[in-house]
Amino acid sequence: MSAKPEWFITLSPTGKVPLLKIRKAGGEDAILFESMVICEYLNETQGGNPMYAEDALVRARQRAWIEFSASMLGNLWQFLNASEQAIADSKRTLFRGQLERIESELSSGPYFSGAKFSMVDAVYAPIFRYFSIIDASMTERIFEGLPRASAWKTALAERESVKAAVSSDFEERFNFHLRQQSAILST
């Protein structure tokens, strides 16, 4: 959204989504912003399996790989939205290099740390979601020779909670966005 409404800017100091509105005990609303802050809050306050490992070192490494995802998302987003071939190629190369780095860290799967879905998986799922929308041959080139990253991407795409995280018209809306940006990938 290029022209954000005033009500949104009032709620979101960073001007970004997502936002989470929470009713406090006294009836007053509190707004949380920033994806990871919201994820941490939900992990700490909602029932279910914890999304982080119990071991402090493993948990710290999970958080480090979550931090790594921010740069990956930035490179991917610039690649997806590029209207110039040189920028698209540069960002695709950077993203591919980051995937190669992750490849060596991945377990035998299906998720980042093995059989258990974790916060790392929840953070990377939106990154990998775009690859089900863009041209399949482009996805194949980016993931070529990276069997663990490819399997991880597939496992996340098949997970019901990941599918349910976006509206049924997500692909249509994203393609519309690419056309608005005159992105190379929209052609």
Predicted ranges, named:
Residues 159:
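C-terminal active-site-capping segments
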Residues 1-110, 183-185:
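GST-like domain detector, emphasizing the conserved glutathione-binding G-site
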Residues 49, 132-138, 163-165:
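Substrate-binding/catalytic groove segments of enzymes
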Residues 114-137, 142-151, 156:
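GST superfamily/GST-like fold recognition
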Residues 33, 91, 129-130, 143-144, ...:
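Catalytic cores of transferase enzymes with a strong primary signal for eukaryotic protein kinases
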Residues 166-187:
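Acidic/histidine-enriched, glycine/proline-rich intrinsically disordered or flexible terminal extensions
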